[in-house]
């Protein structure tokens, strides 16, 4: 059984095929892999253990995905249950993927795939979008214990996911659970960091009823020391970066009614996060958020018509959030105090803030798949979203002298029609997709916070996109893949409407359009003793027009999204991983990517652009990861497992501004970090004890516009599993 699509630690439901997988042919049709391959292989198995039926099914699904036409990296339980404490740390070791964080545990972070980042990335849990509610829950909230595998799509996003993701997607597939299951863990680490999560499931087979309950709690002071290079290398300790988050959820599922599966879920969240200053020593400013989500899902095969599969899901989330900044003085790092810019307070900017905003978010997805013949299928996907923001910040309005926050609405509908087919004894797989996008928004905005210039904007847009992907198995060991796409991404609610405290509305943003091509080759060899060797190389090129970028506003501490222009991307990535022996696993990957500004002139003018053909700033262009694992069974006694893990990450220095003139010195230095872990399990993995050390050499690392990151950290984790 799987937890909720929106936060895995919480809700438990029945096993289902991954939404991004190729369609499953009729029972008499042969399934890939072809002869000479095994459906389950060691690249998707964690440490040696007995596999139940659900696990074998999940492994067969992962093997099918390796031969899907999309460019794809699979992260197995072996790679997830390693030295990482969070999903972001796991994703940061994937070829072509970078994670840019602003600080320690719980800090703002962005996932970048092949240089395309942030809102372009599709974020999914069991095939259902989590991006619409990312202000309240994120992929990084998902405990790694609960993840079966992670699918990182590069380029084309599978049609079944729906939505407007462009250039890449991350889909987290949750573990299947037996009828009775209890999983609880607790981790304590440096800087007073605590992580606790648990999940419980109980099934009543005679009634077809399944109940699930779960939750998590994460807290950290994040009070590590950092060097402020902008203040003559001053060494200070962070004092306002504490993070607290709690989540509780439950689910109920029925499998003996007319629908094959009918499921309802709920999630409660609460978050408080301090705002750490760099130029100034912030003491009390913080963000807060809470939300309540309910969802409903229904599935049925042969929906009134033989061969037609019905999959419907919908969710509604109501959230409250805001920035609290009421400090009456500002603090410099040398201890001196200064008056705030506003007589009403505010240490982070020119205005005081006590936001109590409300947002309503709705998501709905309908997927209809019709199997025309055993090797041919037609798929219709409808994906709709709606957002209604109700900002409320009386203190900020008083600071301005007039209202500066207004209600706004945004609706979007994406319609996708896909055709998937196999040829030549299933050696050739093709998928073609056409999409239509509709978006409508109503909003008011201030063009200038210093002038009461309120403008009402109504927008209705319609766009088309399409893509084609194919893969061909030359031999049982060699597979080639390729794809071409002309895709559109509709700006998100945050990009268009802002967030009512530090991101200003930009309702006149244009949709992004991306033209891309990808080609790759995969070598995969399975051995009779369950070992696997795998190597893959991909080359890619894309051209993004009307690129949306997050840029500072003329108003201090405020920012907005703007259309940047034209960006060309080209790159190559390679990965190799191998079970060298039954007790030794090694991997390595590398990425070179080149993103260039292709605007010949400034927007709306004929003036030449001085940054033409320069590298886009704040995006790494040369990266590598490598590591390995040693594992033994019964090394220190019967029914025990031992694992030793080492992971390394290299990022070559890069600039956080255009490399021209005085900005040549705005460099983020090269980083090489090592993480290690020792894991010992007892009683057939009922008890597991793990010791983790990150950044072994205690190197200084920075990211995201030269923001300092933590040095060496240590943690210990205890997990109890009853099944």
Pin down the residues of each PLM region.
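Extracytoplasmic beta-strand/coil segments of soluble accessory domains associated
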Residues: 72, 88-129
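Conserved C-terminal beta-signal and adjacent last beta-strands/turns
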Residues: 241-255, 269-271, 471, 482, ...
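Short acidic/polar hinge/loop motifs at secondary-structure boundaries
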Residues: 128-155
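Membrane-embedded beta-barrel scaffold of Gram-negative outer-membrane proteins
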Residues: 473, 481-485, 512-570, 591, ...
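Face-selective signature of the C-terminal outer-membrane beta-barrel domain
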Residues: 252-270, 289-450, 455-457, 462-463, ...
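Periplasmic-side early beta-strands and strand-to-turn transitions of outer-membrane beta-barrels
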Residues: 179, 187, 204-285
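N-terminal periplasmic "start-of-domain" segments of outer-membrane beta-barrel proteins
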Residues: 49-81, 110
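Gram-negative outer-membrane beta-barrel transporters
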Residues: 424, 534-535, 540-543, 562-655
């Amino acid at each position: 059984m799987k937890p909720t699509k929106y936060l895995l630690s919480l809700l438990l439901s029945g096993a289902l095929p991954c939404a991004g997988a190729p369609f499953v042919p009729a029972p008499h049709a042969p399934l890939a892999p072809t002869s000479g391959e095994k459906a389950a292989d060691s690249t998707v198995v964690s440490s040696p253990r007995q596999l139940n039926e659900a696990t074998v099914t999940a492994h067969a699904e992962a093997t099918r995905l390796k031969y899907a036409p999309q460019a794809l990296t699979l992260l197995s339980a072996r790679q997830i249950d390693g030295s990482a404490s969070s999903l972001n740390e796991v994703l940061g070791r994937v070829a072509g993927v970078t994670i840019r964080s602003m600080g320690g545990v719980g800090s703002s972070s962005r996932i970048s795939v092949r240089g395309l980042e942030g809102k372009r990335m599709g974020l999914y849990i069991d095939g259902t979008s989590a991006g619409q509610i990312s202000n309240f829950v994120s992929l990084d909230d998902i405990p790694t214990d609960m993840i079966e595998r992670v699918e990182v799509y590069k380029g084309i996003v599978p049609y079944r996911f729906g939505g407007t993701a462009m250039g890449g997607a991350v889909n987290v597939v949750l573990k299947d659970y037996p009828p009775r299951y209890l999983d609880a863990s607790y981790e304590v680490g440096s800087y007073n960091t605590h992580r606790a999560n648990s999940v419980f499931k109980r099934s009543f087979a005679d009634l077809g009823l399944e109940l699930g309950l779960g939750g998590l709690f994460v807290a950290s002071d994040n009070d590590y020391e950092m060097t402020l290079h902008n203040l003559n290398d001053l060494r200070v300790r962070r004092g306002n970066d504490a993070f607290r988050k709690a989540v509780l959820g439950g689910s109920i599922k029925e499998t003996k009614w007319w629908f094959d599966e009918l499921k309802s879920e709920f999630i409660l969240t609460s978050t408080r996060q301090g705002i750490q200053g760099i130029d100034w020593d912030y003491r009390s400013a913080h963000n807060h958020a809470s939300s309540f989500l309910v969802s409903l899902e229904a599935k049925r095969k042969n929906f009134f018509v033989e061969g037609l599969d019905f999959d419907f899901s919908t969710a509604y989330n109501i959230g409250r959030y805001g920035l609290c900044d009421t400090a009456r003085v500002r603090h410099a790092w040398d201890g001196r105090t200064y008056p705030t810019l506003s007589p009403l307070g505010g240490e982070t900017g020119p205005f005081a803030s006590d936001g109590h905003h409300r947002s309503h978010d709705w998501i709905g997805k309908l997927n209809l798949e019709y199997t025309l013949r055993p090797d041919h299928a037609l798929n219709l996907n409808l994906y709709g979203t709606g957002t209604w923001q109700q900002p409320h910040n009386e203190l900020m309005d008083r600071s301005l002298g007039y209202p500066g926050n207004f209600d706004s609405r945004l609706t979007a509908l994406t319609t996708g029609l896909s055709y998937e087919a196999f040829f030549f004894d299933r050696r050739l797989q093709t998928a073609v997709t056409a999409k239509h996008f509709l978006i409508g928004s109503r909003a008011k905005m201030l063009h200038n916070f210093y002038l009461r210039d309120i403008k009402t904007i109504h927008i209705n847009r319609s766009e088309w996109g399409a893509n084609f992907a194919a893969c061909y198995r030359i031999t049982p060991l060699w597979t080639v893949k390729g794809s071409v796409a002309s895709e559109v991404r509709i700006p998100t609610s945050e990009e268009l409407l802002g967030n009512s405290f530090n991101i200003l509305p930009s309702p006149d943003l244009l949709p992004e359009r991306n033209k891309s091509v990808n080609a790759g080759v995969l070598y995969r060899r399975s051995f009779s003793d369950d070992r696997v060797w795998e190597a893959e190389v991909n080359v890619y090129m894309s051209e993004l027009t009307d690129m949306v970028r997050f840029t500072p506003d003329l108003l201090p501490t405020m920012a907005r999204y703007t259309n940047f222009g034209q960006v060309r991307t080209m790159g190559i990535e390679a990965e190799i991983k191998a079970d060298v022996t039954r007790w030794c696993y090694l991997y390595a990957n590398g990425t070179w990517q080149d993103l260039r500004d292709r605007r010949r002139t400034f927007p709306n003018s004929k003036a030449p652009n001085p940054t033409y053909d320069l590298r886009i700033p704040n995006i790494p262009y040369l990266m590598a990861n490598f590591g390995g694992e040693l594992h033994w069974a019964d090394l220190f006694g019967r029914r025990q497992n031992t694992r030793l893990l080492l992971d390394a990450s290299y990022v070559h220095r890069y600039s956080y501004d255009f490399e021209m003139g005085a900005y040549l010195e705005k460099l983020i230095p090269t980083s090489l970090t090592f993480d290690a872990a020792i894991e010992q399990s007892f009683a057939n993995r009922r008890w597991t004890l793990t010791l983790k050390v990150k950044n072994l050499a205690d190197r200084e690392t920075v990211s995201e516009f030269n923001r300092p990151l933590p040095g060496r950290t240590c943690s210990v984790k205890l997990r109890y599993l009853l099944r």
